[in-house]
A protein has these predicted regions:
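C-terminal accessory segments of proteins
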Residues: 1-35, 42-227
Length: 227
């Protein structure tokens, strides 16, 4: 499992540290934003075939891998491109959906239990939530059902609602998390112990783990994925 939650805990420590330079804190904040987004992508919390990077698929006729289409092809097809203007338009639509649209009734629950003094536990819950979609949406019929298959049709149509939901959750949680860090900066600086962390993010590269381990992790938290 790619330890996004470990990264978030460590970079939270660095953001509130009084012993780091302004540049180091700035870098830590950038990584914190990055990892909170990353943790909501189901395959960033998955060991199977290095988070799907080793599962070959096609998308709109182009060869790629399962991880990549969840990172890139699916959202870009939905937004119509990868320009900053496309991202801003999507963000505006998601903001409306959260404030007064389809997510308005559930958005408050997304930050329930958020505790920046315990970032590991907080974000582990988010990772577990995202990982559940591996079984229900990413590979609901197992790895063999998607290998070498073009996933830009029916698969995309089923996946896009989860992609959009997870991005909305990530945005709401990121805003709430950063607000909480800012409000509790002095308390956090006293309570959190600063660890030595490689700012390149190399400490958080994924480790290869066999499928049986991935199954055990999912079963331990109550997921029924058996493939």
């Amino acid at each position: 499992m790619f330890c996004c939650y470990s990264a978030i805990a460590n970079y939270t420590q660095r953001v509130v540290s009084t012993s780091l330079s302004a540049t180091e804190v700035n870098h830590a904040l950038r990584f914190l934003v990055h990892f909170i987004g990353d943790i909501h992508q189901p395959l960033h919390d998955e060991a199977l075939e290095v988070g799907g990077n080793d599962i070959d698929v096609t998308f709109a006729g182009a060869a790629t891998n399962l991880h990549h289409i969840w990172d890139t092809e699916i959202p870009e097809k939905y937004t119509g491109g990868y320009a900053l203007s496309d991202a801003k338009a999507w963000a505006k639509n998601l903001n409306s959906a959260v404030n007064s649209g389809i997510y308005a009734s559930s958005a408050a629950s997304w930050i329930k239990g958020l505790d920046v003094t315990d970032p590991f536990t907080t974000t582990l819950g988010w990772a577990s939530e995202a990982n559940a979609y591996v079984c229900s949406t990413v590979i609901p019929q197992g790895q063999a059902a998607v290998e070498s298959v073009d996933l830009s049709g029916a698969y995309y149509n089923k996946a896009i609602s989860v992609v959009e939901l997870q991005i909305a959750r990530a945005g709401v949680r990121l805003a709430a998390y950063l607000d909480a860090v800012a409000k509790n900066q002095k308390v956090l600086a006293k309570r959190l112990v600063l660890d030595e962390v490689d700012l390149s993010g190399a400490d958080f590269l994924p480790e290869s783990r066999p499928l049986s381990k991935a199954k055990l992790v999912r079963e331990a938290v109550g997921y029924g994925c058996k493939h």
